[in-house]
Amino acid sequence: MEHKRDPKRYHTGINDNLVPLEPLDLSKINDFDDMLRAQSLTAFGGRTVGEAVDTLFEMASDKDTFVILTLSGAMTPAKMGLLVCDMIDKGYAHAVVSTGALITHGFVESSGGVHFKHNPKMSDLELYRKGYNRICNVIELEKSLDDIEKIIHEVLDQFDKDAVSSSRILTKALGKWLADNVPGRGILKSAYFKHVPVYIPADTDSEIGLDVYLYMIRSVIEGKKPFGFNPFLDLQHYAELVNQQKKIAIITIGGGVPRNWAQQIAPLLELIQGRLPKGKAPGHIHGIRFSYGLRICPESVNWGGLSGCPYSEGVSWGKMDPDGTFTEVLEDATVVWPWIFKATIQRFEKNGLTIQKNFELKDQLKRVNELMRQYKLA
């Protein structure tokens, strides 16, 4: 069948409700919000970065939306830690799911340690001999890791050895230590003051995990009772917290385990409803899917990894609302995350708005603790 265009039937774009693009006019740009708002009316990656501000602003403005921030990649030695602090302090994030390494390097900085620029003239063998651990073009001192091991063991000394712990309990305790001993800012310190839980699903895959393991082994060698550690307590706590929400959103920095662990909550709640014995499944559990998502990660979808898969793939798993609002920025987070977040902050300020939510996180956490006492995982 031959297809021909009829010039008499050409559309104008406007009659199909297409949005006109606009030239980027630097003479009209006064701040980050102006720049990214203008970029949202351009094309390609620039447009996506601009649209990311729209999505972040919308999820933060939605009074019923609980936001989960997931973190992977070396964001803290890359000096992005204060962005996380601000997202917690300003109410953009109500729960954090992170790699253990990211929390480890952040704790180094929070407790007074310093990261350095890597000198490419130094070989990796030379770095090893001098106690310089390389993370791409950043140096983490082995001495700094030794220093935080002492702090972690000091904190663990205060744990009730008859109780069962988890990563959330440990990160809260470390946040309290920072609050009691360090004047500066820190991710775990902000989380402690704002009652934001911090989960580390792959907690053994990090320096903090190794420190906890060494503490437990040393306890056994010294004839002391090691405390119990159950990662399923984190999953249960997170499930009960998310289950209380009307709507949920996810901000994905990178991908990996934190992203999947956070997203799988939707099918988990569905499985609890459908697969536990009838009459014995928790009656208060309800289904929920993510209504908003903002992902900043350069990984391509064709590699097949979770870090690169689009949110739309999550619809097939029952994780994402097919009618939700999602933006994915395929860029290095250290480049665009500060722009996106600063532009969103400015947009709130310019409109005379603050983040207001219809829930009190502290009250919800109290309810979670009450519900968890009904189970025997601990």
Language-model segments: residues:
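Glycine-rich phosphate/diphosphate-binding loops that line cofactor/substrate pockets in enzymes
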Residues: 52-66, 190-192, 239-247
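Active-site rim loops that border cofactor/substrate pockets in soluble metabolic enzymes
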Residues: 201-248, 258
